[in-house]
Amino acid sequence: MAKVKVRIPATTANMGPGFDTLGMALKLYNEIEVEEINGKTQIYNNGLKSEEDFGNNLIYKSIIETMNKGGYSYKGFKINVVKCDVPISRGLGSSSACIVGGIKIANEIMGNKLELKDMIDLATKIEGHPDNVVPAMVGGMVVSLKTGEDIKYSKIDLPKQLKFVAMIPSFQVNTALSRKVLPKSYLKEECIFNISRCAMLVSALYNGEFDKLRTCFQDKIHQPYRKNLIKNSDDIFKKAVEFGSIGEFISGSGSTLMAVLNKNEDEFVISIKRYLSGLQDKWNVILLEPDLEGVRIVKI
């Protein structure tokens, strides 16, 4: 019976003006190991058996969808999440990691019946939008769009000196609620505001024009409404500027806040940790680099 292990990166999506469009893989990982078995599917977390109904498990659902698409006959699986460093419901692509991991594992078991494009299309169908699943699949920073059921994407070369500081609070932000707070329509001026900044963000990153990044990360589509779901977000962003950040944004739908740096990363981390320690909620601070590879098979 086949046994496969994968490593999947965390992702940060939206990145300011690129709502449901921009995303980037980060060097923070989950690892999933799956073995085909003849009996009933079993779920484990780091070797400890879970009481979770496997039918509701996103990894299992993604495996089944992939195998059904590939016409592969299966019985059951032993699914073991051996590493889970991507925090759940914090805007760092935890659901995308499950989906992409499940699809990659299933395709490997099937003998790679599906092409990369097929896997991306399927992952987007399961997730509902491409901005997390595409970078989780291919790595790097990615612009993604949907045309019907077809997904198109383009990778962006990032300057090597850029680092990203994830400020992760102890509280979650529900994705459904974070979409519910958004307005049903926008003014033309607000749309132009975002289109111009999203376009310039891609150009500024490509050209290494770091002085433009803070303006480019501005947004009027989602962050003004979602920041109220993240306690102290305005004050934290102000402190990030004070401590040397060159750009800030809400990661995905939150609750993680992201700061962008091109120098003095260690000093920034020390300063922001000291500030966050004085707030009511607990915050975890992680210095991250982009992951350029995406999901990968790991030797067992």
Curated annotation (Swiss-Prot):
Instruction: List the PANTHER family hit by this protein, alphabetically.
Output: HOMOSERINE KINASE, HOMOSERINE/4-DIPHOSPHOCYTIDYL-2-C-METHYL-D-ERYTHRITOL KINASE
Check the record and name the Pfam families matching this protein: GHMP_kinases_C (PF08544), GHMP_kinases_N (PF00288)
Q: List the PROSITE patterns.
A: GHMP_KINASES_ATP
| UniProt organism field | Clostridium kluyveri (strain ATCC 8527 / DSM 555 / NBRC 12016 / NCIMB 10680 / K1)
Question: Where does this protein hold ATP?
Answer: P87, I88, S89, R90, G91, L92, G93, S94, S95, S96, A97
> From what superkingdom does this record's organism come?
Bacteria
State what protein this is by name. Homoserine kinase
For this protein, the parts annotated as crossing the membrane are: none
Which GO molecular function, any one, fits this protein according to its record? homoserine kinase activity
UniProt xrefs under InterPro entries: GHMP_kinase_C_dom, GHMP_kinase_C_sf, GHMP_kinase_N_dom, GHMP_knse_ATP-bd_CS, Homoserine_kinase, Ribosomal_Su5_D2-typ_SF, Ribsml_uS5_D2-typ_fold_subgr
Catalytic activity field: L-homoserine + ATP = O-phospho-L-homoserine + ADP + H(+)
The entry assigns this protein to a family as follows: Belongs to the GHMP kinase family. Homoserine kinase subfamily.
**Record keywords, A-Z:** Amino-acid biosynthesis, ATP-binding, Cytoplasm, Kinase, Nucleotide-binding, Threonine biosynthesis, Transferase
Protein's gene: thrB
Q: In its keyword annotation, does this UniProt entry include tRNA processing?
A: no
Does the keyword Transferase belong to this entry? yes
Where it sits in the cell: the answer is:
Cytoplasm
What pathway does the UniProt record associate with this protein? Amino-acid biosynthesis; L-threonine biosynthesis; L-threonine from L-aspartate: step 4/5
